[in-house]
Curated annotation (Swiss-Prot):
Organism whose genome encodes this protein: Buchnera aphidicola subsp. Baizongia pistaciae (strain Bp)
Pfam families assigned to the protein according to its UniProt record, in alphabetical order: KH_2, Ribosomal_S3_C
InterPro entries linked to this entry: KH_dom, KH_dom-like_a/b, KH_dom_type_2, KH_sf_prok-type, Ribosomal_S3_C_sf, Ribosomal_uS3_bac-typ, Ribosomal_uS3_C, Ribosomal_uS3_CS
Domain of life: Bacteria
An example Gene Ontology biological process: translation
Function: Binds the lower part of the 30S subunit head. Binds mRNA in the 70S ribosome, positioning it for translation.
Statement: the UniProt record of this protein carries the keyword RNA-binding: yes
GO cellular component terms listed in the entry, alphabetical order: cytosolic small ribosomal subunit
Protein name, per record: Small ribosomal subunit protein uS3
Family: Belongs to the universal ribosomal protein uS3 family.
Domain KH type-2: from-to ranges: 39-107
The entry's keywords: Ribonucleoprotein, Ribosomal protein, RNA-binding, rRNA-binding
A GO MF term: rRNA binding
Signal peptide annotation: none
């Protein structure tokens, strides 16, 4: 039976960068890897309402730099930067090394697979019909300029006794083309009928210059601009 390869893993080093950027000897590798996992687990839990898509971890000499990609940076920063300072101290306690936190804003959350999947999950948990949630996500992505999108939902849809799988696609989603910029992510909705899985593929276009033409880390927004978002989301 044929299986699909992971779209992100297949493109690593070709048109996609890693989410953990560091080198280690074999003795410390497992310890650092577990530290990365604990940091991501902590941030996902603390920033559950901040629409966090990616967490990139870099490890310069005896320190750690965490870049948080969020559609709502004001929630991450908090009042006068208090929340981000608490996050920095907590990560320092987890890793045992000095921590620097950068925040990158996601300008078009409709084109981010993780945020689209999380949005569908929140609708399913609010008992909105799954077909309506799928079509709304597809329409929003295509309106924002996506070349193609596919959404797949599996589980006890509508509370039926037998689990099934349904999907909806619009445009092109070329999974086998390595230069195709495919955003892929998954999320889970916990409903009264059980867990419903959501998968999202978004095709943004083709990258012809390879990985060298893509910035490894997006530039952090100036703090003055981030404070504007902070005031807006606090309202």
């Amino acid at each position: 039976m044929g299986q699909k390869v992971h779209p992100n893993g297949m493109r690593l080093g070709i048109i996609k960068h890693w989410n953990s950027v560091w080198f280690s000897n074999s003795k410390d590798f497992a310890k650092i890897l577990d530290s990365d996992y604990q940091v991501r687990l902590f941030l996902r839990k603390e920033l559950f309402k901040a629409s966090v898509s990616r967490i990139v971890i870099e490890r310069p000499s005896k320190s750690i730099r965490v870049t948080i990609y969020s559609a709502r940076p004001g929630i991450v920063i908090g009042k006068k930067g208090e929340d981000v300072e608490k996050l920095r101290l907590s990560i320092t306690n987890i890793t045992g090394v000095p921590t620097q936190i950068n925040i990158a804003e996601i300008r078009k959350p409709e084109l981010d697979a993780k945020l689209v999947a999380d949005n569908i999950v929140s609708q399913l948990e609010r008992r909105i019909m799954f077909r309506r949630a799928m079509k709304r996500a597809v329409q929003n992505a295509m309106r924002q300029g996506a070349k193609g999108i596919k959404v797949e939902i599996s589980g006890r849809l509508g509370g039926t006794e037998i689990a099934r799988r349904e999907w909806y696609r619009e445009g092109r989603v070329p999974l086998h083309t390595l230069r195709a910029d495919i955003e892929y992510n998954v999320s889970e909705a916990h409903t009264t009928y059980g867990v419903i899985g959501v998968k999202v593929w978004i095709f943004k276009g083709e990258i012809l210059g390879g990985i060298g033409s893509i910035p490894k880390i997006e530039k952090q927004k100036p703090m003055s601009q981030l404070k504007k978002h902070q005031r807006r989301y606090r309202k």
